[in-house]
Amino acid sequence: MFSKHPFSTHISGRETPDFGEVFDLDQQVWIFRNQALVTVPRSHRVTPVSVTILPCKYPESLEQDKGIAIYLGIQNPDKCLFCKEVNGHPTLLLKEEKILDLYHHPEPMKPFLFYHTRTGGTSTFESVAFPGHYIASSKTGNPIFLTSKKGEYYNINFNLDIKS
């Protein structure tokens, strides 16, 4: 069962992304390092990236009952997460892209979309382009990545802290 949409889409008559922070169940936050998002232990000396989130404008054209289709980006630098096949494997990458440009595109930009599902207090992010592949984290200092090994070795459950 999915919770109601936690994101606002209309503020002052226009679409505006929500902002927040993400950390995994091991209390590792996402930071931007060497052109990648890596996880490090949460502490007062660490400044996590600010994630930007916007729902897909055309959810009816995507699979239903999978969660809320969202675009997921970061601020400073403005980049968005996307999925593409690299050497035969679905891969999570960052691309210089403005989240509002993706939102206003005349059709869903599937490589940039993730099904966001909330269960209790945690969230999962499943690739729309590669169903069954989830954003995951592992050891400290390693980049976040895509995995199809749901619940085996990697953290696929995250806390998403939306700032108002």
Curated annotation (Swiss-Prot):
One Pfam family, short name: IL1
Any GO BP: positive regulation of cytokine production
Record's comment on post-translational modification: N-terminal truncation leads to a dramatic enhancement of its activity (>1000-fold). Proteolytically cleaved by cathepsin CTSG.
The keyword Cytoplasm appears for this protein: yes
Cleaved propeptide residues: 1-12
GO cellular component, one term: extracellular space
Coiled coil: none
Keyword Cytoplasm in annotation: yes
Subcellular location: Cytoplasm; Secreted
Similarity annotation: Belongs to the IL-1 family.
Name of this protein: Interleukin-36 gamma
